[in-house]
């Protein structure tokens, strides 16, 4: 029986990816650690990773824009809201239910993984290990356009578990069409359209370290192997050179363009204002992703959590909301859900878990957040995620 065209391409893509991986594997020494990671506090992981990772690579993963005020405030902002302790609610800890759904996909936890580039910096198996770890956690993996593994490689190890593809639109529509077609054929459940990075933020750590990616971006390499257009493919380039190839002049029409090409739901990522939320929903977004890129873009912008309630009010449940930026605690997950998010994404801690334990390390990070979330739900008198979403949070003004 003759193989389908898509099947033949997938096999070819996997073969090329293996060739490319072999070419650079000896040049950059990434972690090969495998196994569960003992975690008391996610904040402890950063120093452990720093001690063992290449300085430039660690700086790229950890760093934020300019003075990193926005990055720090993302986490600090959660302390401006309180969960009111509730008692005598008749709830057993064993009955706390973290399950939920997003875009019709059942999830064991409301915690998902934020798409992040170049995961091969953290671990030899990169995005493949992260995909396996998120699958084990019963959650969703999201692959970046700038990942070190191809869409086909991730699909091959997903084993039916859901994954999303994050698109950094190129100025070259041939690349967009090539990539979205592959995402659809490989089984991606949604496209994350990132719109908050028309240029890279001023990341001083990368500049001081003269950081250039030691590994190629597999999806860019795959396109370049078939279309010699002279584009940078990651290896030997800085982030500003990569972003320079990406589309800058976004318009709402791009949402329909991506939907038409992919035939998949489109999640618009990087929303920070109620006005933009309303605009992209009117343009056809199937979900919005409230995020300031983890403090890596506009340092003078507000904390992501601070803008979430006003955005949720405008969205008014027309589409689901994903939230990220600064999440380090189960209480942060609780507060984001209570402020209008439907699911909550985590970035850097996932990469730290990946570095320290591969797929099992990724799962360890999600399970730590789940443990803390269960305790916060129990003490806050909420039995399930819907109850969390109905919870009122308090601020200092309420006690004056």
Regions found by a protein language model. Name each.
Residues 27-103, 203, 210-250, 386-388, ...:
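An N-cap/entry alpha-helix motif that binds or orients negatively charged groups
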Residues 136-157, 161-176:
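A gly/proline- and charged-residue-enriched helix-loop-helix capping module
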Residues 74, 304-311, 354-374:
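C-terminal helical cap(s) of enzyme catalytic domains, especially alpha/beta-barrels
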Residues 10-19:
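Bacterial N-terminal signal peptides
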Residues 106-149:
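Glycine-rich active-site/cofactor-binding loop and its immediate structural neighborhood
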Residues 23-25:
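Boundary at the C-terminal end of the N-terminal hydrophobic targeting segment
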Residues 1-10:
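Bacterial N-terminal signal peptides that target proteins for export
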Residues 118, 132, 157, 174-323, ...:
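Alpha/beta enzyme core
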């Amino acid at each position: 029986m003759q193989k389908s065209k898509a099947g033949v391409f997938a096999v070819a893509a996997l073969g090329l990816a293996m060739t490319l991986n072999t070419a650079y594997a000896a040049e950059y020494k990434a972690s090969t650690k495998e196994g569960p990671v003992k975690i008391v506090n996610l904040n402890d992981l950063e120093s452990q990773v720093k001690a063992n990772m290449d300085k430039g690579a660690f700086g790229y993963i950890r760093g934020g824009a300019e003075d990193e005020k926005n990055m720090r405030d993302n986490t600090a902002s959660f302390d401006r809201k309180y969960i009111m302790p509730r008692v005598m609610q008749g709830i057993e800890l064993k009955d706390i239910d973290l399950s939920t759904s997003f875009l019709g996909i059942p999830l064991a936890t409301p915690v998902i993984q934020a798409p992040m580039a170049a995961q091969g910096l953290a671990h030899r198996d990169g995005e493949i290990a992260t995909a396996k770890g998120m699958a084990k956690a019963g959650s969703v993996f999201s692959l970046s356009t700038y990942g070190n593994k191809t869409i086909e490689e991730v699909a091959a190890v997903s084993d039916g578990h859901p994954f999303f593809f994050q698109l950094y639109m190129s100025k070259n529509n041939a690349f967009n069409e090539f990539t979205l077609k592959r995402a659809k054929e490989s089984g991606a459940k949604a496209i994350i359209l990132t719109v908050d990075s028309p240029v890279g933020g001023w990341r001083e750590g990368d500049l001081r370290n003269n950081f250039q990616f030691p590994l190629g971006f597999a999806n860019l390499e795959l396109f370049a192997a078939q279309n010699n257009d002279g584009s940078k493919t990651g290896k030997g380039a800085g982030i500003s050179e990569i972003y320079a190839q990406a589309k800058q002049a976004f318009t709402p029409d791009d949402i329909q363009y991506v939907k038409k090409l992919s035939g998949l739901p489109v999640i618009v990522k990087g929303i920070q204002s109620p006005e933009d939320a309303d605009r992209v929903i009117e343009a056809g977004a199937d979900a919005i992703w409230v995020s300031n890129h983890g403090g890596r873009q506009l340092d003078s912008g507000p904390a992501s959590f601070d803008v979430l309630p006003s955005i949720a009010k405008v969205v008014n449940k027309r589409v689901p909301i994903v939230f990220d930026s600064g999440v380090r605690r189960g209480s942060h997950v609780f507060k984001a859900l209570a402020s209008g998010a439907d699911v909550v994404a985590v970035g850097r801690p996932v990469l730290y878990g990946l570095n320290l334990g591969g797929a099992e390390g990724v799962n360890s990070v999600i399970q730590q957040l789940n443990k803390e979330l269960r305790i916060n739900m129990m003490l806050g008198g909420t039995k399930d995620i819907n109850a969390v979403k109905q919870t009122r949070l308090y601020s200092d003004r309420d006690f004056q």
